[in-house]
Amino acid sequence: DWVCEMQHVILGAGPAGVAAAYDLSLLGHDVVICEREERPGGMLRYGIPAFRLPRNILDVELHNALRLGVQLRTGVEIGNGEGQVPMSKLESEFDAVLLATGCMAASPLPLRGEWETRDLRGIEGVEYGLDFLMQMHRGVAKTVGKRVAVVGAGFTALDCARVAARLGAAEVTIHIRTAEEYIPVTQEEIFEAKREGVRIKG
């Protein structure tokens, strides 16, 4: 087998970063993963609720992927600010730098008219779904109102609705633009959400 030993640093310990580290380790390379968060997993840990992806299962899978000698450094932020690690330092210390920083950014809602250019984060009581879920998983205490409206039709929308119900919202409604049968999630997810009191309105 052809093996070329190199020292790699991977930025991001999400699914892509961990998978790359595993494959590179199998090829005989030395691998270091730098992760901004305190624990690895990326979107799997910080964007998916534990009731949908149990953390013990996630931790076992991550352990199996990283057990080949991969070094994991958490709490590392790349940049030129105070306490950050400059990219130039990584480029000088390693043979290759792999960017696997993930998709942990909320997608803006496509609104028209006066709302088109407005940042919804500045409105009291309005949050982007991914921001809401990540804050929950980082241990930021959240409160919700008695009535919660979720706009969207994917897994993130259902996760937010189910989390809001668990936080004590008396009424949680998911508002969608299409018919329920076209929602891009599994029927099991829809069943579980409804069983927990979530309503879906098209």
Predicted regions and their residues:
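Rossmann-like dinucleotide/flavin-binding elements
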Residues: 9-34, 73-93, 105-109, 129-187
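Extreme N-terminal leader/targeting segments of oxidoreductases
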Residues: 1-7, 60, 123-129
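Glycine-rich, phosphate-binding/catalytic loops in enzymes
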Residues: 27-28, 50, 114-118, 167
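Residue-level detector of structured alpha->beta connecting loops
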Residues: 69, 94-95
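Generic structural signal for residues in well-ordered beta-strands
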Residues: 70-74, 126, 200
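Flavin (primarily FAD) binding-site architecture
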Residues: 101-121, 126
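N-terminal Rossmann-like NAD(P) cofactor-binding module of classical short-chain dehydrogenase/reductase
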Residues: 98
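Rossmann-like dinucleotide-binding cores of NAD(P)H-dependent redox enzymes
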Residues: 33, 37-68, 161-202
